[in-house]
């Protein structure tokens, strides 16, 4: 999760009226989102999941007050309807994980993260995920329909394919904001389907109807499997500025019960920091031996 995207998340959560609650980041890395939470969100309880053992242990050291599980998301057992907010950059790939609660849907990893997180968030709570454009642009609408039946699309922002170049990736990505419905509904909203723009490029209907939420220019480019659509950056524009403008266009309000933040007893998997090390700071350390 890049720092720019983290700032967008925080800004939009503030715009939606979120102050404090239970926050989940299910693929957290070292936890960029947790760093520098605004003062009005600092009372939130933080929960994270990270598969990589070294990265996960680092996150536990940096955020000793957070509940961070170092394991696959499919191996976690958070209760349903528990989190007020879920954020993160979901893994993407043409592979699947075993989770008996979702195996019947045959989800790929990125779709699985959406489905499981929807169940873990309270009705009225918000999910904000970065995902490959495949989530919104894939030809088969079944996963989008699954999501739409359970959540309301508040908005989406399409990022140019160089947005995460510092992480060594060149892929068109979307930031998607969803609000969990109170109940399952049968719906056929526009964003479930694809359409074509004036240049004949196929993409999600949401972006056809909201071209200002595409922070670049959609073009056909050469990909690993032939020609494919991509959002290419436009010269002379600041992505950070365009992100700030785009997020202001997303409307909605988080609506959750004003209950106390959970203090449920969870197994403490954190690593004690050495004396004198401040929270949300870095230090040199010797990591424990990790047997794979």
Annotate each language-model stretch with its function:
Residues 1-5, 9, 284, 289-292:
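Single conserved hydrophobic/aromatic residue that forms the stacking wall/gate
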Residues 3-62:
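Class I S-adenosyl-L-methionine
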Residues 9, 106-162, 177:
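Conserved Class I SAM-dependent methyltransferase catalytic core
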Residues 10-16, 22-37, 71-101, 111, ...:
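Conserved proline-anchored active-site loop of SAM-dependent methyltransferases
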Residues 31, 253-285, 291-292:
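Charged, often flexible domain-edge or linker segments that flank or initiate folded functional domains
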């Amino acid at each position: 999760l890049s720092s720019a995207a983290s700032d967008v998340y925080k800004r939009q959560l503030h715009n939606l009226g979120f102050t404090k609650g239970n926050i989940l980041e299910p693929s957290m890395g070292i936890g960029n989102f947790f760093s520098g939470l605004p003062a009005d969100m600092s009372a939130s309880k933080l929960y994270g999941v990270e598969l990589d053992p070294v990265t996960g242990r680092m996150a536990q050291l940096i955020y000793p007050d957070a509940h961070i599980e170092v394991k696959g998301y499919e191996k976690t057992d958070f209760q349903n309807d528990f989190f007020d907010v879920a954020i993160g950059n979901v893994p993407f790939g043409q592979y699947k994980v075993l989770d008996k609660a979702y195996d019947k849907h045959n989800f790929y990893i990125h779709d699985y993260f959406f489905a499981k997180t929807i169940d873990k968030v309270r009705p009225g709570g918000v999910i904000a995920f970065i995902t490959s454009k495949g989530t919104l642009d894939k030809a088969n609408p079944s996963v989008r329909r699954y999501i739409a039946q359970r959540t309301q699309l508040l908005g989406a922002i399409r990022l140019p394919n160089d947005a995460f170049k510092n992480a060594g990736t060149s892929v068109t990505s979307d930031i998607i904001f969803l609000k969990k419905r109170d109940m399952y509904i049968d719906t056929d909203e526009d964003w479930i389907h694809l359409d074509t723009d004036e240049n004949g490029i196929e993409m999600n209907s949401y972006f056809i109807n909201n071209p200002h939420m595409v922070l670049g220019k959609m073009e056909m480019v050469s990909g690993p499997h032939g020609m494919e659509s991509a959002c290419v950056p436009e010269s002379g524009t600041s992505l950070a500025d365009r992100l700030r403008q785009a997020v202001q266009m997303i409307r909605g309000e988080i609506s959750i019960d004003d209950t106390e933040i959970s203090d449920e007893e969870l197994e403490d998997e954190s690593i004690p920091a050495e004396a004198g090390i401040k929270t949300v700071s870095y230090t040199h350390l010797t990591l424990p031996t990790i047997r794979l």
